[in-house]
């Protein structure tokens, strides 16, 4: 007997989460099935809408103003700029720890590599570090955290022409942490704030850390730490360090695994549970039964068995080539669950550019849809009346070059989930 729901979302990344939240918010009995842990756990925690145009121009000042000029096949053009705005407002309502919603303009956020990233939304923990702020800045690295070289990042920011003086310093992290310790270990210690011994004196860990940074930070108006400043109470950790240092404190977004990404993932999955969405993770959807009327059943592989799941409406949010929502062999590129059409050249050597930094065709491989996000068949009609696609499984854009991945996931996830719920109510 099949496990039933009104809307079944396949995929646990930002697009899948947003789809499920939107469907549940619209009153649909919703279920989310995800094979792997959410890709948010490896994301920086920054939420981009559009940082650069497809031709490489940028940084884009106002991403919403740029959307009407994008190619017709771009997912933003499919859903429309008004839906993108509505979707970002929906995200804002479910992510209260994020800032940037006060303006349409992109913020410029320094990263751990010393680059400046245009982004539409950013964690509150990064707010005091914006590159548009001219306050003198100290970046702090830890000897046991090699992923953040504070001197290197400061030098890169200075060479990029930021409007503030910036320096870097590296200090030992108080307590007994081995090199390469997980970011969650740093965060857990800063949350717990245990007594630690520094130079023979016992003191709370947060105070001990501030003491080690204090001399270097004496002339700084703000101090940036790697993004490990607590998980349960990051605001409390930042406030305590700021009080001890007499300067604003912010986090510098890091590469994977990313604590801001983990925080966002945990928060959004909590929102799913609060909305009544049923969640199953760790088991892949491997096949589907379809008829001329649409998708009837999908099969989840669990402990060697194929468990049928049925719904009135389905959302495909399994990711792109990296997430295996799109796959390929030597002869073809394909979508493995529903066999949705993926437009590509028969010549596999045309899938990429000889220049490593060139315009690779594979970067835009994905499902092409109608204006309600239903995948098209070879004739351009909806392949399945009750199936919609969202996020990186979609084609027609290069999320890495454009810095548009999060925004496309939110906008198309919101549109797909809302449309799925509305289709049920219209029946």
From Swiss-Prot:
The UniProt entry, under InterPro entries, shows:
FAD-dep_OxRdtase_2_FAD-bd, FAD-oxidoreductase_2, FAD/NAD-bd_sf, G3P_DH_GlpB_su
Q: Which SUPFAM superfamilies match?
A: FAD/NAD(P)-binding domain
- Listed GO MF terms: glycerol-3-phosphate dehydrogenase (quinone) activity
Per UniProt, the keywords (alphabetical) are: Flavoprotein, FMN, Oxidoreductase
Q: Does the keyword Flavoprotein apply?
A: yes
Q: Which GO terms describe its biological process?
A: glycerol catabolic process
Tell me which cofactor or cofactors this protein depends on.
Answer: FMN
User: Looking at the keywords, is Magnesium present?
Assistant: no
Which top EC class is named for this enzyme in its record?
A: oxidoreductase
- Pfam families xref list: FAD_binding_2
Q: What is its EC number?
A: 1.1.5.3
> Which pathway or pathways does this protein act in?
Polyol metabolism; glycerol degradation via glycerol kinase pathway; glycerone phosphate from sn-glycerol 3-phosphate (anaerobic route): step 1/1
A GO CC term attached to the entry:
glycerol-3-phosphate dehydrogenase (FAD) complex
Q: Which domain of life is it from?
A: Archaea
Q: What does the record give as the reaction this protein catalyses? A: a quinone + sn-glycerol 3-phosphate = dihydroxyacetone phosphate + a quinol
Family statement: Belongs to the anaerobic G-3-P dehydrogenase subunit B family.
Protein name listed in UniProt: Probable anaerobic glycerol-3-phosphate dehydrogenase subunit B
The source organism is: Halobacterium salinarum (strain ATCC 700922 / JCM 11081 / NRC-1)
